[in-house]
Design a protein with these regions (language model features):
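Short, acidic, small-residue-rich periplasmic hinge/interaction motif at the N-terminus
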Residues: 21-60, 80-82, 89, 124, ...
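N-terminal periplasmic accessory domains that precede
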Residues: 68-71, 108-110, 125, 135-157, ...
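Short acidic/polar hinge/loop motifs at secondary-structure boundaries
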Residues: 101-127
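Transmembrane beta-strands of outer-membrane beta-barrel pores
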Residues: 158-164, 178, 189-193, 249-253, ...
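Face-selective signature of the C-terminal outer-membrane beta-barrel domain
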Residues: 181, 226-252, 267-415, 419-429, ...
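Outer-membrane beta-barrel signature, preferentially recognizing the C-terminal barrel domain
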Residues: 440-490, 494-496, 514-526, 534, ...
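Gram-negative outer-membrane beta-barrel transporters
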Residues: 520-592
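Conserved C-terminal beta-signal and adjacent last beta-strands/turns
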Residues: 564-684
C-alpha cells in the first residue's frame, strides 16, 4: 500500500506538468520535445569541451534547496544513497573550484551543507574526468561565485529536525576581503540523539547438520556532538598569482548504547571520538603552473564494553582500539595553451601514508582478537600527460594517460589509466559525447588490518582482511543532449577485484562473519533519460528514469561460488510549485525496484519528500519547513537465501520533519573551500 501511495504521489505533479497539448504526446521523440517549449527560456545547460555546464542560479530558481549539497541533488542523473551522491547510479568525484576533493563522504556532506545556494555559480559535469584534474571517473566540479570588491559578509543558520528523537544544529560563515588579501572561516555544529532498531532473522546451519535460529532485535541510542571548522587565507600579490593556506578540522564525540534481545541477550556501550586535522598550502601562477602540499592527521580511539549471553557461552570484555593516520601529499601540474586549438598538460603527485592502528581486549576473548600496533605504510605515485584539441566550435577531443604506482607491505604494482572524451555538436543545442575511462579504488585502512570487532552481541564478528586488493574499473559512456535540455546517457562498466563487505554464516562455528572480500568482477550496463517539463510559471517538473543490468561473479566466495545478475529500474520525479513570489513548495519522489549485492537480494525501496520555503525578507531571511521519507519506505530489508545461507535484516525507518532559519548579511558569496579525504579512515 505504501508503494502504491508513493508512486501516486510521485506522479501527481508530473501528470499536471505533462498535460499540455495532445499533439505533443503523439508525435515522434524529436517532435515531442519541440523548440517552442523552450522559447524565451535561458538554457540551463551548455556544452564546453567535454563537459556539461549547468547554470545553477537558473536551475535552482524557486527550488527549496538551501545549500550546495541539496543543490547538487537537483542536477540531472544525481541521486543520493547512504549519505553520498551518485551520478547515473554510480560513484562520482566532487570538486570545488577545480580542485580535487580529498574529503570523505561524511566530511564532504558537512562542508557542502555550509555553502548557501546564493554562492553557487555553475556545476561542470564530466562523465570521464581528464587526468589533469587528478581524479578519475565521473566528476562534478562546483564553481563558486567570487567578488572582487572589498567586503565583509556572512551567514548564520539554526536548524532542528525530528525523527524518533530530535536533532539540532547551528552554523556560521564569514568572509573578509580587502585588496590582495582574503580570509574566510566557517563553523558548524550538529547535536542531538538518534535511535534505530534492527531486527535480524538468521537460520544458521552447522557442519553437523544442526539448525540454529539466531533471531534478535537490537536497539541503539546514539548521541554526541559533531563540530566542523575551517580557517583559510589567500594572498594575491599580483594578477593571476595566488598563495593559499587553509586549516580544516572536524571533531566528533560518539556514544552508543545498545541492547539486544532474542537468541542473544546483550548490553553494549561504545565511547570514542574522531579527530581530523588538515593543513594545505598551494600556489597558482599566471603561466598555468600549480603546486602544493597537503598534510592530514586523523585519529579514532574507541572503547567498547560488552556483556553478552549466547547459546555458545558468555562474553564479558572491554576492548580498546585506535586508528592514527599521518598522510602527506605533494603535487604539481602544468598546462600550455598552443596554437591551432591545441593544449598540453602534465603533472605528478606523491602521497605517503602511515597508519598506526592497534587493538586490545580485556576479559573473556580469544587471543587472536588482539592487534599489535604495527605501522602500515603505503605510497602512491602518479604521473600523467595529456592534450586537448578543438576543431572549430563543434568537435573537441581530450586524451590523457596516467601511470600510477601503488606500494605497500602487501604488494607493489604499476597501472596505466587512459582517458578519452570525444564531443560533437551537430547543431545548436545538440551534443553527442563519447567517453572512455579507467580507475582504481582502494579499501579503507581499517579493512586491511588483522583486527576483529564484535557485533550483534558477539554473534557477529567483523574481521579484517590483509589480503584485500584494490579494484580496477573500466567505463564506456555515451551522452546525447537534446535542445540543451533533454539528456540521455548509456554506459557500460567492468570492475575487476570488486570489493565489498559481506556476511557469511560459518559452518564450523555459530558465528556470522563480516569481512571485506574481492569478487572476480562486477559488470553493469544502463540507460538514463532525463526529461524536464514546465507548466506556465507555477510548475516545473522533471522525470529521470534508469534501466540497469548488473552481473556479479565470485568463484571463491568461501564454499559458495556464485554468478548472479539482475535487471532493475529507478525512477525519480522532482516538482517545484511556485505559490507566490516569496513562497514555494517542492514535492519529490523516487522508487527503485529489486536489486542484488553478492548473494544478497535488495528489496524495492522509495522515498517521498516535501518542502515549503518562505522568504519574508528576500536575500536576507529564509524559513524552511521540510519532511523526508514521509511514507517510511526508504529503509530496505536485505535478505539472502543461497544454499546454506539464510539471513534477513530489517532496519527501522522514521519520517523526518525539520525546520531551518537562515539569515544572510552582505550578499555573502563564499570563497572556495578545500576538502580532506578521510574515506579510508576508520569510522564508528
Amino acid at each position: 500500500m505504501k508503494t502504491i501511495c508513493l508512486l501516486l504521489a510521485c506522479c501527481l505533479a508530473w501528470t499536471a506538468g505533462h498535460a499540455q497539448n495532445d499533439s505533443l504526446q503523439t508525435d515522434s521523440l524529436l517532435r515531442s520535445l519541440p523548440e517552442v517549449m523552450v522559447t524565451g527560456e535561458r538554457p540551463i545547460v551548455k556544452a564546453e569541451a567535454g563537459r556539461l555546464v549547468f547554470d545553477l542560479p537558473h536551475l535552482l530558481k524557486d527550488r527549496a534547496a538551501d545549500n550546495a549539497y541539496e543543490a547538487l541533488k537537483e542536477l540531472p542523473g544525481v541521486t543520493e544513497q547512504d549519505g553520498r551522491l551518485l551520478l547515473n547510479g554510480r560513484p562520482v568525484a566532487l570538486m570545488l573550484d577545480g580542485k580535487a576533493s580529498t574529503m570523505s563522504a561524511s566530511q564532504l556532506v558537512a562542508l557542502l551543507q555550509t555553502i548557501p545556494v546564493s554562492r553557487l555559480k555553475d556545476a561542470e559535469v564530466m562523465l570521464s574526468a581528464p587526468a589533469r584534474y587528478q581524479v578519475r571517473g565521473q566528476l562534478i566540479n562546483l564553481n563558486l561565485q567570487r567578488s572582487l570588491a572589498d567586503v565583509l559578509q556572512g551567514e548564520a543558520k539554526l536548524f532542528g529536525r525530528q525523527q524518533h528523537d530530535s536533532k539540532y544544529g547551528a552554523q556560521a560563515s564569514l568572509l573578509w576581503q580587502q585588496g590582495g588579501w582574503a580570509a574566510d572561516a566557517y563553523w558548524r555544529m550538529d547535536g542531538g540523539r538518534a535511535y534505530h532498531v534492527m531486527n535480524d532473522e538468521s537460520r544458521h546451519t552447522l557442519h553437523d547438520g544442526s539448525l540454529h535460529q539466531m533471531d534478535s532485535e537490537q536497539r541503539t541510542h546514539a548521541s554526541g556532538p559533531v563540530h566542523s571548522y575551517r580557517l583559510a587565507a589567500d594572498w594575491m600579490p599580483a594578477e593571476n598569482h595566488r598563495l593559499s593556506l587553509a586549516y580544516t578540522g572536524n571533531y566528533a564525540k560518539k556514544r552508543n548504547d545498545l541492547s539486544i534481545d532474542g537468541a542473544v541477550k546483550a548490553a553494549s556501550r561504545y565511547d570514542g571520538h574522531n579527530l581530523m586535522q588538515n593543513l594545505r598550502m598551494d600556489y597558482a601562477t599566471p603561466f598555468q603552473l600549480k603546486a602544493g602540499v597537503d598534510y592530514t592527521y586523523y585519529e579514532a580511539p574507541m572503547k567498547q564494553e560488552l556483556a553478552s549471553l549466547l547459546p555458545t557461552g558468555r562474553l564479558d570484555y572491554t576492548t580498546h582500539n585506535n586508528q592514527r593516520i599521518n598522510r602527506w601529499k605533494f603535487f604539481a601540474q602544468q598546462e600550455h595553451t598552443l596554437k591551432g586549438g591545441w593544449s598540453l598538460n602534465y603533472g605528478i603527485s606523491l602521497t605517503t601514508t602511515n597508519d598506526h592502528s592497534w587493538q586490545d581486549y580485556e576479559g573473556s576473548t580469544p587471543s587472536w582478537g588482539r592487534l599489535e600496533g604495527t605501522p602500515h605504510r603505503e605510497t602512491i605515485t602518479n604521473v600523467y600527460a595529456g592534450f586537448t584539441k578543438s576543431w572549430g566550435r563543434r568537435v573537441s577531443l581530450d586524451l590523457s594517460l596516467a601511470a600510477e604506482r601503488y606500494h605497500s607491505e602487501a604488494f607493489s604494482e604499476w597501472a596505466p589509466f587512459p582517458n578519452l572524451t570525444l564531443q560533437w555538436l551537430p547543431r545548436s543545442g545538440h551534443v553527442l559525447q563519447l567517453s572512455l575511462s579507467s580507475d582504481r579504488s582502494y579499501p579503507e585502512y581499517w579493512a586491511v588490518q588483522q583486527a576483529t570487532n564484535y557485533s550483534m552481541g558477539g554473534y557477529g564478528e567483523i574481521v579484517g582482511n590483509p589480503d584485500l586488493r584494490p579494484s580496477k574499473s573500466y567505463q564506456l559512456q555515451g551522452l546525447w543532449l537534446l535542445h540543451n535540455k533533454y539528456q540521455f546517457v548509456a554506459w557500460y562498466e567492468h570492475v575487476d577485484d570488486y570489493f565489498v563487505q559481506t556476511n557469511y554464516q560459518r559452518p564450523d562455528r555459530l558465528v556470522m562473519e563480516y569481512r571485506w572480500l574481492n569478487f572476480d568482477y562486477h559488470r553493469q550496463a544502463g540507460l538514463m533519460a532525463h526529461v524536464p517539463v514546465s507548466l506556465g510559471q507555477w510548475l516545473r517538473s522533471s522525470l529521470s528514469a534508469y534501466g540497469v543490468w548488473q552481473h556479479e561473479k565470485d568463484g571463491d566466495f568461501y564454499d559458495l561460488p556464485f554468478s548472479r545478475h539482475v535487471v532493475y529500474g529507478m525512477f525519480q520525479v522532482r516538482n517545484t510549485i511556485v505559490l507566490s513570489q516569496r513562497l514555494t513548495m517542492q514535492l519529490n519522489g523516487s522508487y527503485r525496484t529489486r536489486a542484488i549485492q553478492g548473494i544478497f537480494d535488495l528489496p524495492a525501496s522509495g522515498n517521498l519528500s516535501a518542502a515549503l520555503e518562505w522568504k519574508p525578507l528576500p536575500q536576507r531571511l529564509t524559513l524552511k519547513l521540510y519532511g523526508n521519507d514521509l511514507l517510511e519506505t526508504n529503509a530496505i530489508a536485505p535478505e539472502m537465501h543461497y544454499h546454506t545461507q539464510h539471513f534477513r535484516m530489517h532496519t527501522s525507518s522514521y519520517r523526518e520533519v525539520g525546520l531551518s532559519l537562515t539569515y544572510t548579511f552582505g550578499a555573502y558569496k563564499e570563497r572556495r573551500h578545500e576538502a580532506v579525504d578521510t574515506s579510508r579512515f576508520k569510522q564508528e
